[in-house]
Amino acid sequence: VFIIAHQNLINPNLKKSISVSDSNNKKSDMGLISIPELIIGNITFENSSALVLQEDKNLFFDCFEVDGLIGSNLFRNSIIQIDAKSKTLRITNDEKLLQFNKLNKLKLKLIGNQKSPYMQIKIKNVVAAEEWVLFDTGMDNFYDLSKKHYDIFKKHNIFSDLGTGTGGQTIGAFGAEEGNKLHKCLLTDMKIGQILFKNIEVVTTNDDNSRIGASILKYSIVTLDFNGKKIYFDLFPENIDKTAIDLVQKSRGISMSIANNKIIVGVIWDEVLNSKITVGDEITNINGVNYENKDICEIITAKSIMKNNKPVEIIVKSKTGEYIKLSL
């Protein structure tokens, strides 16, 4: 699995133990090893390092049936191009071998040993602002807002608040996000280079950094030049003539999460629902499909039905054993 903003990560025996944190700031001891050769296509990377996930924390590896993650620290001297539509990853050290729009670019800051790529975006609601965000293809959402940045922006009406809840809705390398106070907001405008996005619903994250995630790959080819410290965006043909890309979506009254191999109520955003259900209640049925005995990997790898604009019907099993039907 290729994830920008992550370190190389594999699963053999531990060699040297260090402590790291994931996207939810959950910490774990991990091993550190050296890999003499790592071959991708016809390119050989020599003497690269990799973290080692412990045996009892391999749900991600098991469910997606992968042996590791390839992160940005491997490409510190490379140019990589991600074309999600054609499912193609291009790697080179010569920009002449790639075709991309050199006008629509942003500067990159490469932070830490893993060379995590940060770029500056422009955001606007009532007031305009700029924000340095991590480009993270391991995050499925379009945009995650760090709680630290939210506290700053709230004072200046950068976002419109849609709700507040306690719980979690994301899963990192070391497990699901735990009970944090979260905020759901609406951002009117976001500009990434020359591309304008509108109506972005965003939830705060416990991570220190705001992030642009893999969902941007639905709209654009992305080219990262780690040597030149630049990132380029090429809109797909169906988006080129649009003055803005509208990301409006149906706002749901809850967010889902996973605990004890079950789908649960992760966050309650609609205050009316607080009298009916609680965080941690099991979700047993979604749109007529029973999930009580579904395999955890089937749940984790399935495409989320909460991210489209179609109505969703769920059945929630309360702590008292009552089954409650809800329309979201």
PLM-predicted stretches and their roles:
Residues V1-L328:
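Pepsin/retropepsin-fold aspartyl endopeptidases
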